[in-house]
């Protein structure tokens, strides 16, 4: 029997059947084709459930415009707008390392437009790198079904080249040469921590395995 916090119970067989249904539902959802954000969120949940890492999507800030108070103890938001996020999409902790990254997708097949990033995001990644954080962009070429973990150091350099010389995109070849490609799967949907392991290994090698 499975006992819930409310005190209700469910026979173990029924609970197992329910778990199988949830698994099948998740599998069919994956087959339909998820957005990059959905794949990352599902991966983060897998990492959390498995005790591997704690990574969450940062909430989008909201500007509240109008609030009604039908009761003195209760407020009802009548009008609100999403504001532009001030930093990046995701952050968390993995094996004692702080992770901070932005997720971007494109339908392009040969390049990724740098205009998809905002200047404040690049600045934030740069600041986190200065504090020894593991920072990157998770880029999805959705038409090609290819995914890359691009270290922030290369992204920052590409951004600076755009501002200085007008080169407004990263070619697929450049991303291939300066990123870690990951393959989509089932559990997790996007195993981006495999690339993070390689970033950590490279950093240790640069610092003499300290």
From Swiss-Prot:
Origin species: Lactobacillus delbrueckii subsp. bulgaricus (strain ATCC 11842 / DSM 20081 / BCRC 10696 / JCM 1002 / NBRC 13953 / NCIMB 11778 / NCTC 12712 / WDCM 00102 / Lb 14)
CDD domains: RecU-like
Sites annotated Transition state stabilizer: 104
Main localization category: cytoplasm
Positions of disulphide bridges: none
Record NCBIfam families: PRK02234.1-5, recU
Catalytic reaction annotation: Endonucleolytic cleavage at a junction such as a reciprocal single-stranded crossover between two homologous DNA duplexes (Holliday junction)
Protein name in the entry: Holliday junction resolvase RecU
Pfam families: RecU
GO biological process, one term: DNA repair
Molecular-function annotations in GO: endonuclease activity; magnesium ion binding; nucleic acid binding
Cofactor annotation: Mg(2+)
Gene3D superfamilies tied to this protein: 3.40.1350.10
InterPro entries found in the cross-reference section: Resolv_RecU, Restrct_endonuc-II-like, tRNA_endonuc-like_dom_sf
Keyword check for DNA repair: yes
Listed GO CC annotations: cytoplasm
Role: Endonuclease that resolves Holliday junction intermediates in genetic recombination. Cleaves mobile four-strand junctions by introducing symmetrical nicks in paired strands. Promotes annealing of linear ssDNA with homologous dsDNA. Required for DNA repair, homologous recombination and chromosome segregation.
SUPFAM superfamilies: Restriction endonuclease-like
Assigned keywords, A-Z: Cytoplasm, DNA damage, DNA recombination, DNA repair, Endonuclease, Hydrolase, Magnesium, Metal-binding, Nuclease
Cofactor: binding comment: Binds 1 Mg(2+) ion per subunit.
Keyword DNA damage: yes
